[in-house]
């Protein structure tokens, strides 16, 4: 990372930024102060890779924060941001839920398709 930074190939994002066309990162906070989610423009709409902003589907769907977090109000704001950015709840991908492998179409061992 140090070399990439000196080569000006590393970009720190504190907010929102398009990484490549159709893929953006958005700071949401909550779980950690710098927690980010990723949005991906897809044929089905905008998907949100929630990472630790929603560890499990239940966190997002029922607005139940994960038990380890930095900022509780920030976690609820993150849920709101996820809901606003995703085209539908079906396009929200939590960070650690094994149900992802059941809810989405499997295309390989541990690989799913939106």
PLM segments and residue spans:
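Metallo-beta-lactamase
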Residues: 1-27, 74-89
